[in-house]
C-alpha cells in the first residue's frame, strides 16, 4: 500500500473490500497518481451559495426563490431550510483554511444573486458584493484559485414575481448581473461559469415542481428552457465584454449516461434516444449552433412558440470550457403512459444494483461515457468535471473521525475514469469534487451528505472525513491503488 494511515486515523483501504464490485469497474486504472494527469490538470472542490452560505437575510440580502420555496409548503424533507446551511457566510475563513490544509488548489463557488442585487436588478448591495470581494482575496492569499458560477438556482424572488425564467426579460437580467460581478471581481477571478445545470432548474423547477419555484407546467418548462438557453449565451457574451481577454468563460451541464432497459428492443432504444435528447443534449447543442435536438425529441418542437426572430443566431456561444457534472447512469424504458416523452427511468433499487443515499446507481463508468459523448462534438471546447461525488450515510466515531470508505472508493473510481478518458486523448482538463462540505441538498434537506468535510449542523463543527484526507494524499502526489480492482492481490487493511 502507498501509505498506511491518514491524519484522520484510519487506513485508506479499511473495509474497502466489503464494498460491492460496482465501486471497482475493471476499466479503472489499477494505480494512478496526480502526476499521471499532468502538471496543468486542475484539481478542486465545488460548492453553491444557497446550499452553504446561510445568513439568508443578513446585511441587506434580498429573498431568493429558494428562501420562499422552503417556506411555502412541505417541499423539503423534514421541512428543513437553507437559512443556516453550513454557515459559510460567517465561517468561510475556517473553510478556506481547511482547503489550504488539504492542499486544494481550486475552489468553485457561486454568488447569491439576491445578496448582490436584492431585487435582482437596480442598486447593488455593497455589503453583499464586499463579501465576495473578500472571499476572492482570501482564496488568493491561500494560493486557492477562485472559480465563480454566476447562477446556481437562487433567482431573486422579486424577479420570480415578474415571471422569473418564464419571462424573456430574464436573459437581460442575468447578463446585467454577470457584468456587475465581472466589473468588481474580474481582475482577480480568471475562471467563470454562466449557469449551473440548466436542465435541472428548468426541469425540476418548472415541470416537476420538485425545486423552486415549484411549477408543474409543460409551458413553463419550455419557456424557461428557451430563455435559459439564450441566457447562457448572452451571459457568456456579457462576461466576455466585461472581463480581461485572458479570462476563461464556461458553463456547466448535468448529464447521465443512458442505457436501454432491454438492450436490442427497438422501443426501449428509441426511448433512450429521446431521453438523451432532453437530459444530455438540450442545452449543449444550441450552444454549438446545432439548434434543439427536435428530431429525436419531437416534444421540443413546442419550443417554437417562444422563439423570436434572431434567436437562432443568439443561441451559440464559443465557451472556453464546459463543466461536466455527472453522478450516475440512468436506465430508460419505453413508457406509453408518459405522454410526449414516452419514456421513463428504471430506478436502481428496482434493478437490484448498489445505489447511494440519493437513490442513484453506483456506476463510475458513467463519467467516462459522458466525457466521450461531449468530446464527440466537432467544435466542443475542452472539458472539466466540475461536479462529481456521492452521498452516503456518515457516522462520526467517538474519536471524532468519519470513515467514509464508500465515498472514498467512489471518488477514486471516478477519478480513474477521468484518467481513462485522458489516456484515450480526450481533452479533459480538470476534476472538482462535489462537495467540499456537507450542505443543504435542495428538496432532500440535510440528510444526504456529499462532503469531504462533515458538518455537525447543531454545532457547525467541521470534521475532515477519510475521503478528504484521501484527496489530500492524492493531491500531494501519493500513488493511489484502486482497491480491490480486478486482479488485485491487496488484502483488507486493518484499522490503525
Ranges and model annotations:
Residues 91-112:
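Catalytic domains of carbohydrate-active enzymes, especially glycoside hydrolases
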Residues 111-124:
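Glycine-rich, proline-tolerant flexible connector loops at the mouths of alpha/beta enzymes
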Amino acid at each position: 500500500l502507498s501509505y498506511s494511515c491518514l491524519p484522520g486515523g484510519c487506513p485508506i483501504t479499511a473495509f474497502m473490500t466489503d464494498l460491492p464490485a460496482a465501486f471497482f469497474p475493471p476499466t479503472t486504472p489499477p494505480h494512478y497518481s496526480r502526476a499521471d494527469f499532468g502538471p496543468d490538470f486542475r484539481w478542486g472542490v465545488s460548492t453553491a451559495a444557497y446550499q452553504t452560505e446561510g445568513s439568508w437575510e443578513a446585511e441587506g440580502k434580498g429573498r431568493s426563490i429558494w428562501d420562499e420555496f422552503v417556506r411555502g409548503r412541505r417541499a423539503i424533507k423534514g421541512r428543513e431550510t437553507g437559512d443556516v446551511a453550513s454557515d459559510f457566510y460567517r465561517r468561510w475563513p475556517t473553510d478556506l483554511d481547511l482547503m489550504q490544509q488539504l492542499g486544494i488548489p481550486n475552489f468553485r463557488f457561486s454568488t447569491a444573486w439576491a445578496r448582490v442585487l436584492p431585487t435582482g436588478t437596480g442598486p447593488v448591495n455593497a455589503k453583499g458584493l464586499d463579501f465576495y470581494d473578500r472571499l476572492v482575496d482570501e482564496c488568493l492569499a491561500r494560493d486557492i484559485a477562485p472559480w465563480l458560477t454566476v447562477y446556481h438556482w437562487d433567482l431573486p424572488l422579486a424577479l420570480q414575481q415578474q415571471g422569473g425564467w418564464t419571462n424573456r426579460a430574464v436573459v437581460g437580467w442575468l447578463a446585467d448581473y454577470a457584468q456587475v460581478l465581472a466589473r468588481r471581481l474580474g481582475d482577480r477571478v480568471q475562471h467563470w461559469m454562466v449557469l449551473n445545470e440548466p436542465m435541472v432548474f428548468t426541469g425540476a423547477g418548472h415541470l416537476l415542481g420538485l425545486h423552486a419555484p415549484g411549477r408543474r407546467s409543460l409551458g413553463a418548462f419550455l419557456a424557461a428552457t428557451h430563455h435559459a438557453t439564450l441566457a447562457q449565451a448572452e451571459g457568456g457574451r456579457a462576461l466576455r465584454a466585461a472581463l480581461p481577454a485572458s479570462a476563461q468563460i464556461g458553463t456547466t451541464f448535468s448529464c447521465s449516461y443512458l442505457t436501454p432497459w432491454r438492450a436490442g428492443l427497438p422501443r426501449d432504444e428509441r426511448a433512450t434516444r429521446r431521453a438523451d435528447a432532453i437530459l444530455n443534449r438540450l442545452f449543449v447543442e444550441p450552444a454549438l449552433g446545432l439548434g434543439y435536438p427536435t428530431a429525436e425529441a419531437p416534444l421540443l418542437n413546442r419550443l417554437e412558440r417562444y422563439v423570436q426572430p434572431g434567436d437562432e443566431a443568439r443561441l451559440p456561444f464559443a465557451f472556453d470550457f464546459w463543466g461536466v457534472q455527472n453522478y450516475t447512469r440512468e436506465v430508460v424504458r419505453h413508457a406509453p403512459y408518459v405522454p410526449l416523452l414516452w419514456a421513463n427511468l428504471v430506478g436502481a433499487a428496482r434493478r437490484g444494483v448498489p445505489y447511494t443515499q440519493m437513490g442513484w446507481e453506483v456506476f463510475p463508468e458513467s463519467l467516462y461515457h459522458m466525457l466521450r459523448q461531449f468530446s464527440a462534438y466537432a467544435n466542443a471546447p475542452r472539458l472539466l468535471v466540475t461536479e462529481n461525488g456521492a452521498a452516503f450515510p456518515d457516522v462520526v466515531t467517538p474519536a471524532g473521525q468519519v470513515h467514509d470508505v464508500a465515498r472514498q472508493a467512489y471518488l477514486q473510481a471516478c477519478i480513474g475514469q477521468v484518467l481513462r478518458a485522458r489516456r484515450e486523448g480526450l481533452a479533459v482538463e480538470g476534476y472538482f469534487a462535489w462537495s467540499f462540505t456537507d450542505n443543504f441538498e435542495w428538496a432532500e434537506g440535510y440528510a444526504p451528505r456529499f462532503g469531504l468535510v462533515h458538518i455537525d449542523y447543531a454545532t457547525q463543527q467541521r470534521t475532515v472525513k477519510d475521503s478528504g484526507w484521501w484527496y489530500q494524499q492524492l493531491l500531494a502526489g501519493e500513488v493511489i491503488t484502486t482497491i480491490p480492482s480486478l486482479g488485485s492481490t491487496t488484502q483488507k487493511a486493518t484499522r490503525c
